[in-house]
C-alpha cells in the first residue's frame, strides 16, 4: 500500500506534465473500472505518441472531447440507448476527411485527432465511420462523473490547453487489464507519471462547486423536525433540496437517501413500482435514527417533465437508474452538509467512485417490512 501511495503524483504535477505535452497514466478507483489509461493532451498529438499507445497500451485509442466540441463537430452517439456498465459516451468513430490512406496507421490516426481537436474544426473536416473513437465528457467533468473521459478533458483545461485529449487503456502482456501494481512497474519502465482520478476530484472540489447553498430553515413534517437546505444547480439552474436531521459529521455513519427525480408523483405514489425507498419511508427511517440526510434532486419540474413522469410505466423497486451527472451533484451537497460515512437507503448497485469527494458508502439500509 505504501509503495502504491508513493507512486501517485500530485495533481499539480500531472497538470504540469500534460501542459508540457507528456504522456501520463491515469488510474480510477478500484471499485470502478480499476484500470489505468495512457493519456496526453490532443494539442500535442504526434504519430510517435499514437504508436506508443498502440504498441505499449494495447487498448482502444479514443479521443475525449467536451460536449460543446462534440456538438461543433456534429458528433452523434454511437447508440441511441447507452447501456454500457459505466455509461461511457462513445460517438460514431471518425476519420479526417482529407490526407488519409487506410486510416488505421499511427500517422493517419494522429492526423484525424489533430484535425478533429482543432478549435475551429467543423463537421466537414471529418467523415464517419473511421478509426478514432471520440468520447464525450459530461459537463462538469469529474465533479459529475468520475471517469477517464471527464478526467482527460479536465486535465487539459487545467493545463490551459484545448479541452480534448487522447487515451488508451493499458493491458498486460497476457492480455489482461493492468492493475495498479502492474502500472507502477510500467510507469517506472517508461518514466511516466501516475495520477489518480480521485485526487483530481478532490483538487477540483476544493476549488470549484457545481452547487450553491441559497436558503435554509427548519420545517415540521409528518416524520419529525428537519432542517431544510436549498441548493441551486450552477450548470442547469435547477433547485435541489436537502432535509437534515441531527448533526452529520465526517466520522459518524448516518442514513442517507438521494432521491431523483423528485416529482409530485413521488410524494403521492407509495406503491411497489416506485423508487427502492419512497420519500416517506426514508424520512421515517431518518426520524427513527435521529440523524440522517435526505437529498431531493431536481425539485424544479416543468410541465413536460411532469407529463413524462406520469406516463412512465411501473418498474420493480430499485429499477430506476440515476442520471450519472447527478451522482456528482448529490456528492457535493452531502459533502457541504458534513457527511462522511453513509449507509444508503437504496437498492445495492454499482456506483461511481465517491472517494474523491471524501465520502464512504458503508453499506445499504434494509427497507422496513410492512
Regions found by a protein language model. Name each.
Residues 1-370:
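Catalytic domains of riboflavin
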